Swiss-Prot record:
Key words, A-Z: Ribonucleoprotein, Ribosomal protein, RNA-binding, rRNA-binding
Name this protein carries in UniProt: Large ribosomal subunit protein uL4
GO BP term, example: translation
UniProt xrefs under HAMAP family: Ribosomal_uL4_B (MF_01328_B)
Source species: Mannheimia succiniciproducens (strain KCTC 0769BP / MBEL55E)
GO molecular function: rRNA binding; structural constituent of ribosome
SUPFAM superfamilies: Ribosomal protein L4 (SSF52166)
Gene assigned in the entry: rplD
NCBIfam families: rplD_bact
Family matches, as Pfam families: Ribosomal_L4
Positions in coiled-coil regions: none
GO cellular component: ribonucleoprotein complex; ribosome
Similarity remark: Belongs to the universal ribosomal protein uL4 family.
């Protein structure tokens, strides 16, 4: 199959990478696993055993007229322990390489079908200026966009940092969440070739 390159001849690409069937279940599983892996998982609360304080019974069991109480660290009390205290945990989920690559291929194929993948010969700017990048994107009628280059262009990266709906990645930095998060994905010809090699 071929992908149309803006202002140039069509680029021949692999059917298995850019012409794959849409697999929603696989993409969902991989995206959930990716998001789970990004969780910090460091929250920690204290149980009644871990809260600092005396273990003495606050008042006698009977005769005061108050509700019976055996411990100031009881979860019922203010400043007491948490009943089912959260502990640090690893939320990451295992995803096989074949599944991960399959999900990326499926996303790329769907981007092609929806005309959301824009292939350009090169994507460069002369200076790390946000207004220069904004003008270049305006010329291509692009706004909410992920730009993928073969290697990270420092000028592009610096110019895009201040733009909320623009992100710049190299081929090694792409992930399923970023691919589906933007309205358009701009890829250079060299990046397309690298992606094919990476997913082969």
């Amino acid at each position: 199959m071929e992908l149309q390159v803006v202002g140039a001849n069509a680029l021949a690409v692999s059917e298995t990478t850019f012409g794959r069937e849409f697999n929603e279940a696989l993409i969902h599983q991989v995206v959930v696993a990716y998001a789970a892996g990004a969780r910090q998982g460091s929250r920690a609360q204290k149980t009644r055993a871990e809260v600092s304080g005396s273990g003495k019974k606050p008042w006698r069991q009977k005769g005061t007229g108050r509700a019976r109480s055996g411990d100031i660290k009881s979860p019922i009390w203010r400043s007491g322990g948490i009943t089912f205290a959260a502990k640090p945990q690893d939320h990451s989920q295992k995803v096989n390489k074949k599944m991960y690559r399959g999900a990326i291929k499926s996303i790329l194929s769907e981007l092609v079908r929806q005309d959301r993948l824009v292939v350009v010969d090169k994507f460069e700017i002369d200076a790390p200026k946000t207004k220069v990048l904004v003008q270049k994107l305006k010329d291509l009628a692009l706004e909410d966009v992920l730009i993928i280059t073969a290697s990270l262009d420092e000028n592009l990266f610096l110019a895009a940092r201040n733009l909320y709906k623009v992100d710049v990645r190299d081929v090694q930095g792409i992930d399923p969440v970023s691919l589906i998060a933007f309205n358009k994905v701009v890829v250079t010809v060299d990046a397309v070739k690298q992606i094919e090699e990476m997913l082969a």
